[in-house]
Regions:
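Tryptophan-centric aromatic hotspots in well-structured domains and transmembrane helices
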Residues: 18, 142, 158-161, 180-186, ...
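A structural signal for short, well-ordered beta-strand segments and their strand-loop junctions
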Residues: 6, 33-38, 136-138, 173-175, ...
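Catalytic phosphate/metal-binding cores of nucleic-acid and nucleotide-processing enzymes, i.e., regions
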Residues: 3, 23, 27, 123, ...
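Histidine-anchored nucleotide/phosphate-binding helix
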Residues: 18-28, 160-163
Length: 269
């Protein structure tokens, strides 16, 4: 076949979902088959697409290898439409905007949403999830310390301000790679500290009613997969630090409450 579409899957889980979503949308747009290779790129952040073949990527078609594909590279960081070639095409880039699958939101959400089996299991494990105003808080610290001038870290002041925007909540679910820091700096009465595989944490996060997210594609996808029509989502106004891309406006969603934050020495507050 000479009309296939594929993409390089690279980065963490959130990055890879963006890349796959863009490829799938191009396939639907041009009525072409989309295939993926589990190890199509040198992994960053220690994430292999093969980790997700049986869960988040269970609805994708994987093949052992692809040959004869022409690479089409993403343009500037902000959204810019890129078109597949008339023959086999592999997209290369990050494609971090829902504009890359505009018109196919429902299909994309269905493709990557939690399985019914997972939902049943997680409600049994965390019955608090069924409460009316559950809140997820994502606090990313560990890997950001290596390059805070690229990936700045949202501190406790940001979380406290975001809590004021959220208002009332019944139970908090904390998702963090530094739970000890959270316990020392933020106090909650009804709280669960989630510690599980990354894809399970993302899915569990998506089942919370409301979200305090950070500048992370991981929490981006958790909020997108949330089907609560009245969900509240708070995000920081700064996504990258001074050494990162600055034209990132297209990653923001219209239904977010964007909290104006300040950048100082790698911190967002």
């Amino acid at each position: 076949m000479n009309n296939l579409i594929s993409c390089n899957l690279m980065g963490g889980l959130g990055n890879q979902i963006f890349q796959a979503a863009h490829a799938l949308a191009e396939g639907m747009k041009y009525n072409r088959e989309v295939v993926f290779v589990p190890q199509s790129w040198t992994p960053m952040q220690g994430r292999q697409a093969s980790n997700y073949v049986n869960n988040v990527f269970r609805n994708l078609k994987f093949v052992d290898s692809i040959d004869g594909f022409e690479k089409v590279t993403e343009g500037p960081w902000e959204y810019s439409d890129v078109f597949p070639k008339d023959h086999n095409t592999v997209f290369d880039g990050y494609f971090q905007s829902s504009k890359n699958f505009l018109g196919f939101d429902d299909e994309i959400r269905k493709t990557f949403s939690p399985s019914e089996e997972f939902i049943t299991e997680v409600y049994e494990k965390y019955p608090e999830l069924k409460q009316e105003n559950t809140l997820s808080i994502h606090i990313r610290r560990g890997d950001c310390f290596m390059n805070p001038d690229i990936h700045p870290i949202a501190n406790e002041k940001y979380v406290e301000r975001a809590l004021n925007e959220i208002g009332e909540y019944t139970h908090v679910f904390i998702f963090s790679d530094d739970k000890n820091w959270v316990k020392e700096n933020l106090k909650f009465e009804n709280v669960t500290y989630v510690d599980d595989e990354d894809y399970k944490e993302m899915w569990l996060m998506s089942l919370c009613k409301n979200h305090i997210m950070v500048n992370s594609t991981f929490s981006w996808w958790a909020t997108f997969l949330n089907t609560n029509a009245n969900k509240k989502i708070v995000a920081p106004s700064i996504w990258f630090g001074p050494r990162g891309p600055q034209n990132y406006k297209d990653i923001y969603e219209s239904n977010w409450t964007v909290l104006d934050v300040k950048y100082e020495d790698g911190w967002l507050s």
